């Protein structure tokens, strides 16, 4: 009886020897033999140099496991960058940073605070070495935001959501049994989510929007019930005028997407805008135009009056400080006719012969202190500035009046 045929699967999965390795030519990246792969695919071609060279493996693009291992090692290398390689040394060694004492960088590249006397001179407070990896990244890897992401960081997000869930349950007052169910059973615990799934306005949806229409809203095709009123334009997909000419509907709109702004429409628009802006500023929902129109109207008028009072007060202050100029009325401006008077301008663009305007000073004008009747700098004598009212050369001094002038003249005569 002939012997049974050899088990080709066992022979294929058996560990090849060094000679088999050279014969098959799978290279260092070879993981396992597959009898179903033809020899012209599994063997390296003759023009690939080095059977033990990983870079010469022509089947490297089929090694998905090797690529995953390389990506994992690369991610680990990225996460390890910047960490301490071990405990710090107690003595400065040659080649270390002269500022902090760590290896791997020079003094000009050190990110520590510059010391007056570095670690090379003092030998104190030597920092530990940092892990420096030369990671070669491709075009996409350099722009991958999750290349050095640690999945353990997502636990912080999970904990935050758990805290929010606990706060929500505490707010709802869920009383749980030791079995982890609600007070009325397992269905009571999920009663809060039952209506969220059925409705379009769930509490957990980020894009919650009411699709309901208010009771006062009336469709435009119902404003005028005349059979010839609704004129539809198929190109614009809108009603042309809906017959709004002289009936009740004409007071609401004239044409499509056009509201009449006559009457109290402008005041209504201001009140609505004020209510919206007040809610955005303070978050107070009590100022609602439909729910509480009186409070919003009172506050709006109060702020308007305060704003107008501030404007008038500011105008009066400017008028008292700088004066006012006569305003030419419209009727007088119309009576002024154009003239043919010849006007000549100079190089600066100013009218020749016109009186020069005195520029306003940036300092306070006509402010008298310490009983003075003139400002500092109104008197000049002996190359010194002073007050003209008392001839005093001491700034911020108290005014002495005529007695000070007489004393100043007497002192000048005594000096002469």
Curated annotation (Swiss-Prot):
Q: Where is the composition biased (Basic and acidic residues)?
A: 168-179, 188-213
List keywords of the entry alphabetically: Metal-binding, mRNA processing, mRNA splicing, Nucleus, Spliceosome, Zinc, Zinc-finger
Which residue ranges does the record annotate as region Disordered?
A: 1-34, 168-213
Role, per record:
Involved in pre-mRNA splicing.
Belongs to which family? Belongs to the SLU7 family.
The record's listing under Pfam families reads: Slu7
Q: Which organism is it from?
A: Neurospora crassa (strain ATCC 24698 / 74-OR23-1A / CBS 708.71 / DSM 1257 / FGSC 987)
A molecular function (GO) term: pre-mRNA 3'-splice site binding
**According to its UniProt record, where is this protein located?**
Nucleus
Domain of life where this protein originates: Eukaryota
- The protein's gene is named slu-7
Q: Where are the zinc fingers (CCHC-type)?
A: 95-112
Subunit details: Associated with the spliceosome.
Q: What is the name attached to this protein's record?
A: Pre-mRNA-splicing factor slu-7
Which GO annotations describe the biological process of this protein? Answer: mRNA splicing, via spliceosome; RNA splicing
Offer a single GO CC term for the protein.
spliceosomal complex
């Amino acid at each position: 009886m002939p012997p049974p045929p050899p088990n080709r699967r066992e022979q294929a999965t058996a560990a090849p020897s060094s000679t088999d390795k050279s014969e098959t030519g799978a290279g260092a990246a070879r993981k396992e033999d597959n009898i179903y792969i033809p020899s012209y695919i599994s063997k390296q071609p003759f023009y690939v140099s080095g059977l033990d060279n990983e870079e010469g493996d022509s089947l490297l693009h089929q090694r998905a496991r090797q690529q995953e291992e390389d990506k994992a090692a690369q991610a680990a290398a990225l996460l390890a960058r910047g960490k301490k390689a071990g405990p710090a040394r107690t003595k400065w060694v040659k080649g270390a940073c002269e500022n902090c004492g760590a290896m791997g960088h020079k003094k000009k590249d050190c990110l520590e605070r510059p010391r007056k006397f570095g670690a090379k001179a003092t030998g104190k407070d030597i920092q530990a070495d940092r892990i420096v990896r030369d990671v070669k990244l491709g075009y996409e890897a350099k722009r991958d935001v999750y290349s050095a992401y640690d999945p353990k960081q997502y636990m912080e997000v999970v904990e935050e959501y758990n805290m929010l869930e606990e706060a929500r349950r505490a707010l709802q007052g869920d009383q749980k049994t030791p079995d982890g169910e609600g007070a009325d059973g397992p269905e009571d615990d999920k009663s809060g989510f039952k209506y969220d799934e059925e409705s379009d306005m769930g509490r957990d949806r980020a894009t919650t929007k009411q699709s309901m229409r208010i009771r006062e809203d009336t469709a435009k095709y119902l404003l005028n019930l005349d059979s010839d009123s609704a004129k539809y334009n198929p190109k614009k997909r809108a009603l042309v005028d809906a017959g709004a000419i002289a009936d009740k509907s004409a007071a609401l709109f004239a044409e499509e997407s056009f509201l009449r702004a006559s009457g109290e429409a402008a005041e209504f628009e201001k009140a609505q805008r004020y209510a919206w802006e007040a809610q955005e500023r303070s978050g107070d929902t009590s100022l609602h135009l439909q729910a509480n129109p009186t409070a919003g109207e009172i506050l709006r008028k109060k702020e308007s009056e305060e704003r107008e009072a501030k404007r008038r007060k500011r105008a009066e202050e400017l008028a008292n400080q700088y004066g006012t100029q006569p305003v030419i009325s419209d009727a007088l401006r119309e009576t002024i006719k154009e003239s043919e008077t010849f006007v000549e301008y100079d190089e600066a663009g100013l009218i020749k012969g016109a009186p020069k305007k005195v520029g306003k000073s940036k300092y306070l004008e006509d402010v008298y202190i310490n009983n003075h009747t003139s400002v500092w700098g109104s008197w000049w004598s002996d190359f010194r500035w002073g007050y003209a009212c008392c001839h005093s050369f001491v700034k911020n001094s108290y005014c002495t009046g005529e007695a000070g002038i007489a004393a100043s003249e007497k002192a000048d005569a005594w000096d002469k």
